Each structure stands twice: as C-alpha cells, then as structure tokens.
UniProtKB/Swiss-Prot annotation:
Keywords: Cytoplasm, Magnesium, Metal-binding, Nucleotidyltransferase, RNA-binding, Transferase. Belongs to the polyribonucleotide nucleotidyltransferase family. Its EC number is 2.7.7.8. GO terms for molecular function: 3'-5'-RNA exonuclease activity; magnesium ion binding; polyribonucleotide nucleotidyltransferase activity; RNA binding. This is Polyribonucleotide nucleotidyltransferase. The lineage of its organism: Bacteria, Pseudomonadati, Pseudomonadota, Gammaproteobacteria, Pseudomonadales. HAMAP family: PNPase. Involved in mRNA degradation. Catalyzes the phosphorolysis of single-stranded polyribonucleotides processively in the 3'- to 5'-direction. Residues 554-613 form the KH domain. It comes from Pseudomonas savastanoi pv. phaseolicola (strain 1448A / Race 6) (Pseudomonas syringae pv. phaseolicola (strain 1448A / Race 6)). It is an enzyme of class 2 (transferase). It catalyses: RNA(n+1) + phosphate = RNA(n) + a ribonucleoside 5'-diphosphate.
Amino acid sequence: MNPVIKKFQFGQSTVTLETGRIARQASGAVLVTVDDDVSVLVTVVGAKQADAGKGFFPLSVHYQEKTYAAGKIPGGFFKREGRPSEKETLTSRLIDRPIRPLFPEGFMNEVQVVCTVVSTSKKIDPDIAAMIGTSAALAISGIPFDGPVGAARVAFHESTGYLLNPTYEQLQASSLDMVVAGTSEAVLMVESEAKELTEDQMLGAVLFAHDEFQVVINAIKELAAEAAKPVWDWQPKPEATALLGAIRAEFGDAISQAYTITVKADRYARLGELKDQVVAKLAVEEGSPSASEVKAAFGEIEYRTVRENIVNGKPRIDGRDTRTVRPLNIEVGVLPKTHGSALFTRGETQALVVATLGTARDAQLLDTLEGEKKDPFMLHYNFPPFSVGECGRMGGAGRREIGHGRLARRSVQAMLPGADVFPYTIRVVSEITESNGSSSMASVCGASLALMDAGVPMKAPVAGIAMGLVKEGEKFAILTDILGDEDHLGDMDFKVAGTSKGVTALQMDIKIKGITEEIMEIALGQALEARLNILGQMNQIIGQSRNELSANAPTMIAMKIDTDKIRDVIGKGGATIRAICEETKASIDIEDDGSIKIFGESKEAAEAARQRVLGITAEAEIGKIYVGKVERIVDFGAFVNILPGKDGLVHISMLSDARVEKVTDILKEGQEVEVLVLDVDNRGRIKLSIKDVAAAKASGV
C-alpha cells in the first residue's frame, strides 16, 4: 500500500501520523512524529486464533526507549539495551490501561503492542506520542477494538490556567502533571500528581484534556478511513442463558448468602464449596457444559449478584454502607532499629512501611534518554503472595508493584522538604502484609506516617483512599474504600491521595462507557470526606514530624568553605578527604560552590570530620593564641605547626625576654608550645611569638 500521512495541530505541537512505509507485515503500524523532533514507531499484531487454554485476554504492551534515539550508546559491558527501565514499565502500563476495556468481552486472541522510541529530544516525554500511535495502529489493524482513543498531558499554573502537552521545562514550574486518555464520549484513564490542588481544579483538568484530545481522535478516524484493514469477522460466544438460569435457580440464594460473610477467607471458602457443587451437578456427562464453562457462568452469577445488591442499596460485601471507611489501626515506631516505621491497617489491608535516610551518595542514578540524573527519593512497594494467603512467585518487582510504588511516591513527593532544607536521600519501602483492596493507598498513609516518625520535616500529612463505582443503566453507586472483590466486580477504580488542603495524586481507571462529569464530581467529593476522616485518625497518632531525627539515622552537618580551599580539603589524588573519611567513619560530599555535607553514623563522627575540615580551611587569626607543635628548628628560630598545613615562624628573638644563644636551649622538635600570632603577610607567611603569650593572656586574649 502507498503511505498515508495525516498531520494535525495538537496544543503547542504539530503531530504527524504515517502508515504504509515501515513495519508493513504487522497487523497495524504507525509512525508518530511530534514537531520533527520525537518519533515513536508503534506496531500491533493480533493472533488470528484464540488460545483456548487461557481464561483471560492476552494483551501485552511493550514501550521501549532506544538509546540511539537520543544519539547515545548504552552503558555497561554489552553495550545494548537490557531489561525494561522503571520508566518504560510505567509507560507500558499507561498505554495498556485505556485500551484494555475497549476490546470486546470474550475476545481471547493474543494482541501485542510494541512502541519503540526511535528519535527524541530533551523537550517532551514521548509517552503521549506512544499512546496516540497505539490508538492509531489498533484503529487500522482490523482487530476488534471500540476506539479510537485520544490522550493528552495537562499542566496547571495559578496565573495562566491549564496548559496542553507541556514541555519538561514547563512541567518544572507546574502544579500539576496529568495524563488523560479516553474516547470521544468518555474518559477512560487518568494518571496525575499535583501540589495540593482542589478537587474542582483536578476535575477541570480532566475535562480540559478530554475536550482537547478530540482533535487526535478525529485525525485517527481520518487515517483509518484511508488505511484501515477490514475488521475481523469475530463473533462473541452466545450467552449461556440456560446454564446461567440453572445456576441462579438452584444456587442463587446460596451465592447471595455467601456474599454476606464479612471475613474474606471464610467467604472465599464458602464460594469455593458452592462452585464445586455447581460443577459436580452440571458438568457431569458428555454433552453437558464443560467444567470451565460452568465455572465461568458461576463467576457471572457472582458478578451480577454483588452488583445488584449494591445498586439496590443493600449492604456491601462486608456489611458497610457506600460511604464508610473500614476500621483503622495505626501504629508508628514499630521497628526498633529502623529510622522511621509505621504499621497501617485498614480492615483486612495492612502495610508495614519503613523510611530510611541516607547520604547524597545513596541517591539513585537514573540513566535516561534525557541524560543522567540523581533521584534522592525512592518509594518501593512489595506485594508478597502471603498477603492474600497464597503461595506464589518471589523475586524482583513486577509491573504491578512498580506501578503501585510510583502512585504512592507521587502521592507524598509534593509534601517532602526541598534538598536545601533536608539534603538526605530518602527511601521508603512498603511491605504489604495483608491485602483486601486498596493496598497502594494504605502505602500512602503508611509512608506519610513513617516519614514523620523518622523526623523528615513533611509539609503536611498525606492520606489516600480508593473509590469504586457500580453502574447499571441509570442507577449507580459510588463506593468508598473498596474491597478487592468490589474492585474486580466494579466499573471504576478511582484513587485519590492528598492533604487536608488539596489533592497530591489522582489515578482513575474506568471499565465502561458513560462515566459522566456528575459521577466524577460525586466521587471526588466522597473521596475528600474519606481522606479527611483518615487524616484525622492519623493525626491522633502522629500529627507532625518529630522534632529530631531518629538516633539510628545518620547525622548531617552542612558547612561552606571558600572555593579556593576545596583542593586543600580533597588533597592530592583525594588523599586528604579519604583519610578524614577513614579516620572519622564519616562521608563528605563537596560541591563546586564550596558547600560541604558531612554525614556520620553518629553525631560524634560527623563533628570529628567537621573539625578536621575546619582545621584544613581555617586561617590563622592575628592576636589569637594557638597550641602548636614544633616541626623544625633552624639557627634563626623554629617553625611551629598551628593548623593543618599551616606553619609559622617563631624568630629566636621571640622565644624569650632573656637573650637566647641557641634555639635548642628552649625548644625541641615535636614539643607542644603555646604561640601568639603576631602577623600574617600578603604571601600568607605567619609570624609567631612565644614570649608574648603570657602578656596576651593577661590582657584577656
């Protein structure tokens, strides 16, 4: 086919969509170029046959940043790209979330999306281009897909309002970094971090983005009109109406009764028994439904039962109404040797969160397409299988753990002190020890508590809450503090974190069409009510950061020296600074402007290192008495060391009031003596006196 190209203006940028020139054997391939600057090649391939063995939709999204895109060669021994970076993993999730709900129910053919950044600058993030390219590639692929999807990034300034698709530089001055994706009718996904914006400002940003990315959707429709392949002739399996009716007739009441059991383990055990009974009764002979078909129908009855109960105003699975937060149990300082710790329990969800303080050298080094940079704040989320009472894989963090950790990080980051106020590296680890819904928001609450327990001067405490939605026709119910089952069976996952003043993070994933502005507004208002409730209970345990750092945390001393003294502190080949660190067990970081940060495992170690630095950088003061050591004796006097690297001369005439024939009659090399600084000439030579010390002391020097 001949190449098809569509251009459109999108905010500050010109976007070009091109297909038919590259990767023509893929089901769909689009090259997205932004301002002749950023180029992302997106390919989509769909398997023609479904994998009968899989009980889920096998969609995979791979976003990859090639170093050649920025004119760089990879570091390391092998000199080629390795495993996905955290940024690549997070962007893959960002692309996956809005497209997944748009594939038809029951579609089980494998679909693989690969987004490759092939050219980039240091001006904008390529993620929006990758999202647009994914939507366009799916639209022309022929794969059943209810798109297209548009996407946009939004910034916010108090003076100028909302800004579409900001540059990195513009984001630095922004109070908001939000990515929104959706169809022409509805918003499907929101990912954001903010600096205490109001709920109205956050909702305004979502609606602003939705309006602005309509131009993207229109351009993709125009591209598809010229370049799309025929849509696959795929039909969903007919609904097993008879099987569903049989299960509901005989087991419907028992299933409904099981969902009144409030303890998760007991409820799961009862539902497991019922499922076994259903399979034993209905999947018994040839010609009857298979066990997998019966289990799928049983799951559908579960789905309908829970949703009907909720929209009809019945109590939720654990007996709560729609607005109640589960009971909280909050503890801080639970681990004796850590720098800060908290145990946050909300119902059957529990997070053990630990904060650790380190030196500037402990900051994470990030090698990105934009260049190397250091990150002084890390938040890591771990979800071991025992947290849900299961055996499972143990190992490195998966995509879900990386995503949840980043959401928790975004939630608390805006409330951390600046490096000029608190120059420590901070690492927070959230260990999920129990889980039944909203473990990422438990991590937010626990992180805030652990940081305050460690003495990190937080600007304000932060709490988070997960909201849910069940919508049947015109009836809907918004749920506060959702359980795991409510997340799975509901239509929306809506997580909001913030302080008492405003929102710091908002994440939203919607599985259905037709989420209105009214629903989002109600959800934000209900989330604020819950957040303030949780913050109130957190503040009863610890309402502000401790006045002092933990005794287990390293001590930091900041000082400044003249820039011409830096080389003296470092020494030849780093010998001086290395010796100080080895002898005092402290670490020293020196900046080009003379700023010095000294970190010691104890106050004594840090102070000892500070005194050594002061000794090296100090200047001899005229009229001050020093205790020095005789380094060398000559015929006309003695050289005495009064400061590290600084010797002065005591002339023979300055040794005593009496006449001195030989210097060695008064002094010996290695002897400690008190000397008075008489003068320092313009060449830095120091003139000392021993005989004038007594008079100087008498005068109060």
